[in-house]
């Protein structure tokens, strides 16, 4: 019996954090569009349930570094992605409904992503600290698909999922997010001999060129998703050979709010 309890405790530690509260809020207040290629967020609904959101954020903030370090890698990454997305919603709510873009919440000297308002793993952090420090900068994860998972509250962003990320399902969830984003022709499309893709691929190009599934160039990464991009095998080959150009679309920074119509 004692051994069984130890094994159950160890498994619970490895599984990470209970995301049921965040999952329930997402299911209630995120609206799927175009078969999940995009979503809109009911910020008024989130505002009405802000006490539940704050309770969830408090539970996130209560996690210690020692606890976090005991979790499996996938559970850690799911926790960080969920934290980023939930604290982004909270940031929007600090000004909602008088906010048309997350960029409105910054100043000339400091972007909203550099605001330190997030108590997390023993420090007060910014959204940039989570994404570029804990996720991208830690060296633990080497996962380019996080760029299809973190959501910056904008129409141009990959969709905020209608469910929380979970460590035991993270691989499938990240792949689903990548498939949804890359199959969205408002964000990524072939025009004649030019592949026009989201500016995400410009800003984070290096992340897509680090050898994930053998992709050492942006073209090679995009060719991995040729079906989602609507490319036949020959076109994907020409893309990898540099015979199809890559250009980056303008980013739509308008708030991804319910009724925005294009998100």
Roles of regions detected by a PLM:
Residues 15-263:
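Interaction/scaffold regions that mediate signaling and macromolecular assembly across diverse proteins
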Residues 1-8:
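Bacterial N-terminal signal peptides
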Residues 10-14:
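Sec/Tat signal peptide C-region and signal peptidase I cleavage site
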